UniProtKB/Swiss-Prot annotation:
Domain of life: Eukaryota
Main function: Regulates ATP-dependent protein translocation into the mitochondrial matrix.
GO cellular component: TIM23 mitochondrial import inner membrane translocase complex
Protein name as it appears in the record: Mitochondrial import inner membrane translocase subunit tim16-A
Major location category of this protein: mitochondrion
Species of the source: Xenopus laevis
Topology versus the membrane: Peripheral membrane protein
Subcellular location per the Swiss-Prot or TrEMBL entry: Mitochondrion inner membrane
Length: 125
């Protein structure tokens, strides 16, 4: 009786082990496909974030923009830069943050324009 019980337990563990291994392989494959789907633009954006020291979300919050439109970014940048002018009682630190945020958003718009141009060229031909 104990022998049969031990065999059942061992078989059950083997089944669970195989199922776990299969699920793990599927998860790795899905992760790889998702990473490839994000493409190079996500990698470039992450690299720019690490170089500039400011994330895209933080830059958008600083300049109070939700969409990356050059006009809105420039308008908010000029306003915040003038308001934080040290000569007018503003903060040089905040002014620096505003400049870094604008630089980061400009870099992101450049990356987006690079990734959208090849797609547009292929649709035109």
């Amino acid at each position: 009786m104990a022998k049969y019980l031990a065999q059942i337990v061992v078989m059950g563990m083997q089944v669970v082990g195989r199922a776990f291994t299969r699920a793990l392989r599927q998860e790795f494959a899905a992760s790889k496909v998702a990473a490839e789907a994000r493409g190079r633009a996500g990698t470039e954006s992450a690299a720019v974030s690490s170089l500039s020291g400011i994330s895209l979300q933080e830059a958008q919050q600083i300049l109070n923009v939700s969409k990356l439109t050059p006009e809105e970014i420039q308008k908010n940048y000029e306003h915040l830069f003038k308001v934080n002018d040290k000569g007018l009682g503003g903060s040089f630190y905040l002014q620096s943050k505003v400049v870094r945020a604008k630089e980061r958003l400009d870099q992101e718009m450049e990356i987006q324009s690079k990734t959208h141009k090849p797609k547009e060229e292929t649709t035109q031909t």
